[in-house]
From Swiss-Prot:
The chain crosses the membrane at residues 83-103. Plays a role in the recycling mechanism in neurons of multiple receptors, including AMPAR, APP and L1CAM and acts at the level of early endosomes to promote sorting of receptors toward a recycling pathway. Regulates sorting and recycling of GRIA2 through interaction with GRIP1 and then contributes to the regulation of synaptic transmission and plasticity by affecting the recycling and targeting of AMPA receptors to the synapse. Is required for faithful sorting of L1CAM to axons by facilitating trafficking from somatodendritic early endosome or the recycling endosome. This is Neuronal vesicle trafficking-associated protein 1. GO terms for biological process: amyloid precursor protein metabolic process; apoptotic process; clathrin coat assembly; neurotransmitter receptor cycle; neurotransmitter receptor transport, endosome to postsynaptic membrane; positive regulation of receptor recycling; postsynaptic neurotransmitter receptor cycle; receptor recycling. It is a single-pass type II membrane protein. Residues 1-82 are cytoplasmic.
Length: 185
């Protein structure tokens, strides 16, 4: 461990080590300026273009120059068009963000009132929860389940005659249908 609170001014004087378990090594030592600067080089060599030209005269093969091919989509386009495109992209991005927020609010932030349970993103009464759990998740099977449930309910209820249609008129209609079937046969 290092004992804090050493005086850096007393660098030259050595203190005897104390027997308390701490070293008296200073945490920071001053830097010498000579360590930071490198001596300047004796000779500086600067290569110029004239030094490379003799290589061409000697017949050495140089790689062929390849023409640069750059395509700029903004060349010849006005600043007004660039700003318009930037604004359109910003509006498209903001529209996507708004739709995402609306979707999340619609899809996940559903709270049902008392006495209702959230089942398949719909609030249903607690009494009908067992009916909805019997249904399968596919839409076609849900459709057939509802139809079968309607047929069972229709059979359990006694057939009632509408007040505007009497039993006699039903019998007349059935007789007319049978006569029409006999004539066509």
């Amino acid at each position: 461990m290092v004992k804090l609170g050493n005086n850096f001014a007393e660098k030259g004087t050595k203190q005897p080590l104390l027997e308390d378990g701490f070293d008296t090594i200073p945490l920071m030592t001053p830097l010498d300026v000579n360590q930071l600067q490198f001596p300047p080089p004796d000779k500086v060599v600067v290569k110029t273009k004239t030094e490379y030209e003799p290589d061409r005269k000697k017949g050495k093969a140089r790689p062929p120059k390849i023409a640069e091919f750059t395509v700029s989509i903004t060349e010849g386009v006005t600043e007004r068009f660039k700003v318009s495109v930037l604004v359109l992209f910003a509006l498209a991005f903001l529209t996507c963000v708004v739709f995402l927020v609306v979707y999340k609010v619609y899809k996940y932030d559903r709270a049902c009132p008392d006495g209702f349970v959230l089942k398949n993103t719909q609030c249903i009464p607690e009494g009908l929860e067992s009916y909805y759990t019997e249904q399968d998740s596919s839409a076609r099977e849900k459709f057939y389940t509802v139809i079968n449930h309607y047929n069972v309910a229709k059979q359990s209820i006694t057939r009632s005659v509408s007040p505007w249609m009497s039993v006699l008129s039903e019998e007349k209609l059935s007789e007319q249908e049978t006569e029409a079937a006999e004539k066509s046969a």
